[in-house]
Amino acid sequence: MDLTKQFFKYVSQNIFGLLGTSCYILADTYFIAQVAGTDGVTLLNLCLPIYNFIFAIGSMIALGSATRYAIAKAQNDARGQRYFSNAILCAVLASIPWMLAGAFVPGALLRLMGGDAGIVTLGIPYARIFLLFAPFFMCNYIVSAFVRNDGDPSLAMVATLSGSLFNVVFDYVFMFPLGLGLAGAALATAVSPIISIAICSRHFLKKENTLQFVRQMPSARLLAQSCQLGISGFVGELSSGVTTTVFNFLLLGLAGNVGVAAYGVVANFALVATAIFNGVAQGAQPLVSRCYGQNDHAGARKLLLLGSGTVLVLAAVLYAAVFGLTDTLVSWFNSENSVQMAQYAHTGMRMYFVGYFFAGFNIMAAGYLSAVNRPVEASVTSICRGMVAIVTCSLVLSAVFGMPGVWAAFPASELLTALLTLFLLRRKESGKA
């Protein structure tokens, strides 16, 4: 199949899959807003960074290990099988602290994220349940990434969408007919990755399957090799958590719980937007890694250009939709009809989403750098985007401009990162893919 056709096949299927993942959090927020109003939206926004931290670990292990596997497979190196087994084992070990936190200190974790007494009391059942299921969130990321890299992106997409559909349907069933409230929302979210893993497991029964689970002890060396290439995925997910945490504390000081609830609306739609651009980067990754493994540097560069053009078009479509539907989108999560919350969220949506004109390119470029075994540049880009630039811009701009400065921090930080990323790409363009 032509490389361009392969690109759009992998990317489109991966976008749909990741959209499903983000939409189940969107569904959680919608149903929780109906049950608990702005306090419920505030609670979920305080929990979002915890989700991000769990997904960040899973993403780093999954994408890094799957990239190592894809490169080894392209070079006919049988040792690539060990990356799959090691990824599963390390993810289970990495999830243990989250499970312990869910079992014993969910309230302390919510207080650490900025929750007051009322929010903590409301959120303990929700946080406890989803933290206890942390291994399934991480392993779902891993199984999906490896199935995609083993030539079955369609099954990975179907599995992710099926898990997300289960979450949306059972959010409603558990919360309303069964009356389980926020605990029901957490239970539906927690079970959805199990559904996805079960469907992805069909790949192992196919004759085209080349993945095998090798009996071995967890290897710190293999994990370190994988994490070098997975750091962009880690920081990409973690950046959402860092951004949400910093913004939450700034907005609590500027506008209280109503400000955090308004940001909750923005953050939930931002998850959907980020999923679209992650879909482009992660969809292109197996193809870029294959080109790199076969020394097809021209093919790898072509995929970078295709990806960059795709994210720019998607950013324009996304912003047009957000700008035209701002009031409608905000109203979905404003069951109490709070005028102040609606005003904050309206301004926030229109300012914040300008940043995706730059964020899409940054996500694509970081994924490309990892896929062609340039972990240092990928790490620099990702850390600038996810840590340094966003924290600096949010602190400085909020101090000068108040709430508008908080909303402007995301576009400003993504612009600065895009300039750095362009420099890194051009600096070694003649020497590497």
Positions of PLM-derived features:
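Short alpha-helical transmembrane segments in multi-pass integral membrane proteins
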Residues: 1-15, 69-135, 177-231, 288-355, ...
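Helix-loop interface residues and adjacent transmembrane-helix termini in multi-pass membrane transporters
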Residues: 26, 35-38, 72, 149-150, ...
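Structural signal for membrane-spanning alpha-helices in multi-pass inner-membrane proteins
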Residues: 29, 102, 145, 171, ...
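Membrane-helix interface/capping residues of multi-pass secondary transporters
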Residues: 29, 38-41, 153, 182, ...
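Small-residue-rich hydrophobic transmembrane alpha-helices
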Residues: 41-96, 100, 137-156, 262-326, ...
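Hydrophobic transmembrane alpha-helices of multi-pass small-molecule transporters
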Residues: 53-56, 167-171, 197-201, 271-275, ...
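Short runs within selected transmembrane alpha-helices of multi-pass transporters and secretion channels
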Residues: 62, 129-148, 156-167, 185-198, ...
